[in-house]
Amino acid sequence: MTVVIKVGGARAVDPAGALADVASLVEQGEQVVVVHGGSTKVDETLERLGIDPEYVETPSGVVGRFTDETTMEVFEMAFGHLNTRLVAGLQSEGVDAVGLNGVDGKLLYGPRKSAVRVVEDGKKKIKRGDHSGTIKQVNGDLLGSLLDDGYTPVAAPPMAGSEARSASEGSSGDEPREQVIPVNTDADRSAAAIAGELDATLVLLTDVEGVYEDPDDPATLIESVETSEEWAALEAAAEGFMGRKIMAAEEALSGGAPEVVVADANADTPILSALDGDGTHVQASAVQEADQ
């Protein structure tokens, strides 16, 4: 079994239990890829530098970070710091962990979005200067080689963003040449893309037990989603940050992952418990039925 684990970056999430579980899975002979976020660390670093983080709302109602050039520099610094810490933590657990970002080997690759559609004061606008991208390809060969050699990849944004460069900007010949630059992308969706590429089970760890029918009532935990009707109910229940996780779940399942689990990062054994039935389990059949 191959498992992709998304470790969140929220203040309320302690990764210690997840790292121990990764070590247990690797010892059992399972192949594991760890993907981490870090938005909280980015915001904390921006605050120390006296810079206000900027979030924008898309016309579809999704709220996301606007990443200008300065924020992108902070992003690379913060994610690099977190990646090193997680790799060291896993190595302390006896795991041969290797740190990667999405630019390495074009692990996560796709077009850069320099302009985004946003809603400000009720009006739709085009906001330029964004450093973000959409993942179109995952270098599964790179991950497969590392896994087959006994390594545990620890991956994170930024991704390799592609944009055309004209001849006047340094390319030869008449045809534009690709320019690759590091750009921001969502960590949940990065994990989803990797899980889809590897046909792996995806575990999305967060600071709650799973998806609740009533977001304010943990007793309403949705435990299993297998049909299109249950999928529709899941989408309706997911609010705020959880909506982004369900979007990632759909992308993973559509891409080839057999199952996605949304589970509590702060459980005693968060990954092992999730694989054993805790959290919200979404099967590929739910998305396949919904697409028919």
Where is each model-derived feature located?
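C-terminal catalytic "cap/lid" subdomain
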Residues: 2-59, 71-292
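Glycine-rich active-site loop/strand segments that organize a redox cofactor
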Residues: 60-67
